[in-house]
């Protein structure tokens, strides 16, 4: 099916379900999962949009997700990195291309509904920016 699965996570409940879906897809084909956690950096004080996660928290959460899949017998790698506010979808699409992902898995809504209101859905943007299939999990 898919030898390489990219799953984009952000600590939301939908991301937890996306992680489970990525695990299942990889298990079906003895594939590999790449977990990507992007931390938006820009602070826009007048709008009240600030990074709500420290780099340490991001890495701890990523390590937990990697361990979960590894303990389930899935080949897994992970990366947590910073991105510019509003560039998350482009980063996800570029990462899928760079690492040869056959499919991108992500949650339908992330942690911030306010961000979704102003910028649109990250999942929607990824669908339009990539030539890869995208599985959106709710």
Annotate each PLM feature.
Residues 3-48, 52, 70-77:
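Small/aliphatic-rich secondary-structure junction motif
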Residues 50-60:
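A short acidic, glycine-rich active-site loop
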Residues 103-125:
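Glycine-rich, Arg-bearing micro-motifs that act as flexible, cationic patches
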Residues 134-137:
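Short, flexible loop segments at boundaries between secondary-structure elements
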